[in-house]
């Protein structure tokens, strides 16, 4: 018995030593300095300056890019410069923590991929030092992997999505459970939108520093009883002998049963597609064809379209009208005020209050107006006047929405985009300072 235990311990120790002694061959090590001229001059998403380098595959390349001077993101882009079509970004290492000129990316003998400033300050790493890594590469599906001598992945970019999922990439219960939008095309920090894999559904949320909790504004439906999603994968599935479809495929952790929601059917190769939560709060699927030239990209799915018959047009996106506005069929066409509906432009904003004292403000009413928050958030059951009283007592409440048919109430901590419905049972009330004309509840 002692011999067996000793043998097992020796075997385990030998495996550990072999793994810990594995080193990256000199020819596979690299140190890249973020300096010199720019390398990619094709149309590039977000219109940045780009420096590309190894590793790369036929359709993917690792790059430094910046949309503001001296603030670089380490990212993977998809596209081929030969096609003269837009290059797009599908993965980022250091969103919100940009590096400067002369920053370094190092893949050394110990197998750790390290992004550091010129002075040596660590910005990002894969935490793969001394874990048996022997190489790094980008697979044909866009997954950048660090692997050991047996080919097993020690680290993979697919485990850390930002706002994008490539085909075969997942949100996972025991890993990254959400995508987060970037703030804008020119500002690469986290934006207010997130796509979250919850226990039984996939939900779009809107969050700002004014909202007490994230506000759901869209849900993907799965018409099967689910216990708990273990993962949610953007997947290409064979639709027929000649076509492929793109789906979001969930795996139930209890039954291991797969459920999916269909997204699109690209006319070209579906495997070079990605789904992204855009900075504008919409979700789009982009499909890339290596056969095309200047029209290599197709948007094959959009969550919010102006042709949507289910009420999910662009007016349901919280900041579609930027700061404030009344919207219909995707068009922001009025700026609500206590003087009536004024013409809308980008300067439209909800009224500002100088005080929380109810004596200093009033409400103006918008008949037939709805909010992005009402469809997927239950609200509370109460009377219209009680709903108003609740908002009046809450200093952070900017207005409220009421459904007279269902007697449901929603308090608005962010008003943003309102939808013009033509349904008089839906009414919005907005707080305004008393210096202006007063409307009553």
UniProtKB/Swiss-Prot annotation:
Phosphorylated on tyrosine. It is found in: Secreted, Cell wall. WD repeats lie at residues 254-296. Residues 1-22 form the signal peptide. Residues 356-433 form the PAN domain. One of its GO terms (molecular function) is carbohydrate binding. It holds the Pfam family B_lectin. GO terms for cellular component: apoplast; Golgi apparatus; mitochondrion; plant-type vacuole; secretory vesicle. Disulfide bonds join 387-409, 391-397. PROSITE patterns: BULB_LECTIN, PAN. Transmembrane segments: none annotated. GO terms for biological process: cellular response to hypoxia; response to sodium phosphate. Induction: Up-regulated by fungal elicitor. Up-regulated in both heat- and senescence-induced programmed cell death (PCD). Keywords: Cell wall, Disulfide bond, Glycoprotein, Lectin, Phosphoprotein, Secreted, Signal, WD repeat. The keyword Secreted applies. Glycans are attached at residues 102, 258, 269. Residues 29-159 form the Bulb-type lectin domain. InterPro entries: Bulb-type_lectin_dom, Bulb-type_lectin_dom_sf, G-type_lectin_kinases/EP1-like, Pan_app, SLSG/EP1. May be involved in a cell-to cell programmed cell death (PCD) signaling mechanism. PANTHER family: G-TYPE LECTIN S-RECEPTOR-LIKE SERINE/THREONINE-PROTEIN KINASE SD2-5, RECEPTOR-LIKE SERINE_THREONINE-PROTEIN KINASE. This is EP1-like glycoprotein 3. It comes from Arabidopsis thaliana (Mouse-ear cress).
């Amino acid at each position: 018995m002692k011999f067996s235990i000793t043998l097992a311990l020796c075997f385990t120790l030998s495996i550990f030593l072999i793994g810990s002694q594995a080193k990256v061959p000199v020819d596979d090590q690299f140190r890249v300095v973020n300096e010199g001229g720019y390398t990619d001059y094709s149309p590039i998403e977000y219109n940045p300056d780009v420096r590309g380098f190894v590793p790369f595959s036929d359709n993917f390349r690792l790059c430094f890019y910046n949309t503001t001077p001296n603030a670089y993101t380490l990212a993977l882009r998809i596209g081929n410069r030969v096609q003269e079509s837009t290059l797009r970004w599908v993965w980022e290492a250091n969103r919100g923590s940009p590096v400067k000129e002369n920053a370094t990316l190092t893949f050394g003998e110990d197998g750790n991929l390290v992004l550091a400033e010129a002075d040596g300050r660590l910005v990002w790493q894969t935490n793969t030092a001394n874990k048996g890594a022997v190489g790094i590469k980008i697979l044909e599906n866009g997954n950048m992997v660090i692997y050991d001598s047996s080919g097993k992945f020690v680290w993979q970019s697919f485990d850390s999505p930002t706002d994008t999922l490539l085909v075969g990439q997942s949100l996972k219960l025991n890993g990254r459970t959400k995508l987060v939008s970037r703030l804008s095309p020119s500002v690469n920090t986290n934006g207010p939108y997130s796509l979250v894999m919850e226990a039984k559904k996939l939900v779009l949320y809107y969050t700002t520093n004014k909202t007490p909790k994230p506000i759901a504004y869209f849900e993907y439906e799965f018409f099967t009883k689910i216990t708990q999603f273990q993962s949610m994968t953007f997947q290409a599935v064979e639709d027929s002998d000649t076509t492929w479809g793109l789906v979001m495929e969930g795996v139930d952790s209890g039954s291991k049963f797969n459920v999916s929601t269909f997204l699109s059917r690209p006319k070209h190769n579906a495997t070079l597609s990605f789904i992204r939560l855009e900075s504008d709060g919409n979700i789009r699927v982009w499909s890339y064809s290596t056969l095309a030239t200047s029209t290599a990209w197709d948007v094959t799915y959009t969550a919010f379209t102006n042709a949507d018959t289910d009420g999910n047009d662009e007016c349901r996106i919280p900041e579609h009208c930027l700061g404030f506005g009344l919207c219909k069929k995707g068009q922001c066409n009025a700026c609500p005020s206590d003087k009536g509906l004024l013409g809308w432009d980008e300067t439209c904003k909800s009224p500002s209050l100088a005080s929380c004292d109810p004596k200093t403000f009033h409400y103006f009413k918008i008949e037939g107006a709805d909010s992005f928050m009402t469809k997927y958030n239950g609200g509370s059951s109460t009377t219209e006047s009680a709903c108003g009283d609740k908002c009046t007592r809450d200093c952070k409440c900017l207005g409220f929405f009421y459904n007279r048919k269902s007697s449901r109430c929603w308090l608005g901590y962010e008003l943003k985009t309102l939808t013009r419905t033509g349904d008089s049972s839906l009414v919005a009330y907005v707080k305004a300072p008393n210096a202006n004309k007063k409307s009553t509840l």
